[in-house]
């Protein structure tokens, strides 16, 4: 079973929470962050390059030092304050009428090492290294990771009872997403939550934050090696996560746009597709794929339905049966010559939150030649793949809404 604990969050007073809270560091580029960040915004801590001229490189030592300086300053000014008691917290997010309720807690780095925290994506060492530097220099998890767990009726009841109270925070963000936050500070409920996770929940599933999770585990191992009196209970062994029951989560589509047809004409490309797909022209109106193995394609001002032909993919392989794998193998690799989704500059990825209109816009602008929309992966598929130790192809899952940063921070002290 997993190991969790409460923690004393460092967080903003309720009257300035909207001024401090910000989108995650990887949602905005530096220019967007400069434009959005107010005086108290956490972006000065998560994207400290915005406090310098744009020509300074994001990973310059001055940038990292500025992050530390700002974190200390925010606490000194009272814009971030540490709770006096270790608590659990409930964080609710509402998007388009659907609400998901997460428990904010600390997970143990050992569970990542032993596979109880299950991943579905590979990480890149350079991104891990960057996140590791941030955790190390701040001695804190500034932003949480996003976990799922299999539903537990008693935990669901505790959360349901908690959210009948007036929330500590309650606001709408710039995307019209709702955010609410409650503190669980009574000892009986805290003990009950700890016992339920440690006794009944056998795994966490990383939904979003693979690099932050890996970085937290590496920092924990580093601090462990430097402590001759290490016990495993020190705060550095734990990192901050928001954990949602899997039934409440919805994965959005994660789509692809490609710059060229690898030397083919549109007619030759369509002919090549027909070897592995039933291709049907759908006209100028946006076409959404509505079931597994059905794809939407936008080319030369027209939408097409692509239906993968039986026998052209391995329906016995949990990875081979994924639509991202089918598209990668039969189209992106075999026809368009894109071998590595992580490094090929001819392909880009568009999260489903932007809508399929973003795909046609990028093609019509001339920036891209063709776009593909996929039917979303299900939480069951994600969990089944993680449970079998398999890894999904890059850019398979898009979770929305993203966790808001600045509502809670975990100190490793």
Predicted regions located by residue number:
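Surface-exposed, charge/polar-rich loops and edge strands
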Residues: 1-413
